[in-house]
């Protein structure tokens, strides 16, 4: 009996010693910041996570990854930093701060932040068969200090003002405002992303008069709330082209009618023919005007059909204004050609019938 009791005591002591020397995996949780961490483009950002209850994580596997577990941003395993499995673009830009690893706290530092770094990061701890993770989120922000306002030459439709700004992240809010701070609906708005995924913004506004006073191009970063704006004052003289074009067209039409109808009236009186005669100068003058109108309309339709641009295209507004200007030029050119043809025809006809 004494021998059996002594053997049991020795077994109990050995088992206790083994439990003391062999570390056991305990349950734990991982805590991280609940709110997103803001990171300025080109700066540095730090993401921390902590074991709970606090305990040493030196012997654990610590893995930071984005959306794929097998493609870590940073990997710490068996007391070493392993760069072989790390995504190549993070190898030179990440560092794991382990000053408090004895308490279960580590910090991932990302250098030279780019727009690609925006999003979620998984902080993963593994101890034997026990593992837990927490998710941290990075919000990358970039604000451009350069805003350009361009004024295109006025045409019959009005004055086109365009605002451009490059280098924003994420996509900013963009709008036109008048001198009273009221929002002016834009004629068009578009954006694109460059190779660094930064947003290039473009917005246009077609003005028919100067009732808005000075106008402001306003941009706002939705994450930081930072605002940038540029204003411009438009002179009333820029909006006088509409009436000028109308006067020019009216004058040209009046001259056209004069040059066509006067010779035809003279010939009508000279020949004393009825207006219903197919060869009468009156009908010929009307025929020249009608033919010219058909040619002008045909050229206008052809011009617009061959240069059509989808409404969604960034150049739609500019192309539309270009087509309108070309249409006016075609009308003016055809009016002069018609005047010349009519003048030559009636003069020659009158000359040969003297």
UniProtKB/Swiss-Prot annotation:
One annotated GO biological process: T cell receptor signaling pathway
Compartments where located: Membrane
Residue span, Ig-like V-type domain: 23-141
Primary localisation category: membrane
InterPro entries tied to this protein: BTN3A2-like_Ig-C, Ig-like_dom, Ig-like_dom_sf, Ig-like_fold, Ig_sub, Ig_V-set, IgSF_BTN/MOG
Molecular function via GO: signaling receptor binding
Assigned keywords, A-Z: Disulfide bond, Immunoglobulin domain, Membrane, Transmembrane, Transmembrane helix
Protein function: May act by engaging a cell surface molecule on immature T-cells in the embryonic thymus.
Membrane topology, from the record: Multi-pass membrane protein
Domain Ig-like C1-type, chain residue ranges per copy: 161-233
Positions of disulphide bridges: 49-123, 163-217
Protein name: Selection and upkeep of intraepithelial T-cells protein 1
SUPFAM superfamilies in alphabetical order: Immunoglobulin
Organism of derivation: Macaca fascicularis (Crab-eating macaque)
Tissue expression: Expressed in the thymus and skin.
Alphabetical list of CDD domains matching this protein: IgV_MOG_like (cd05713)
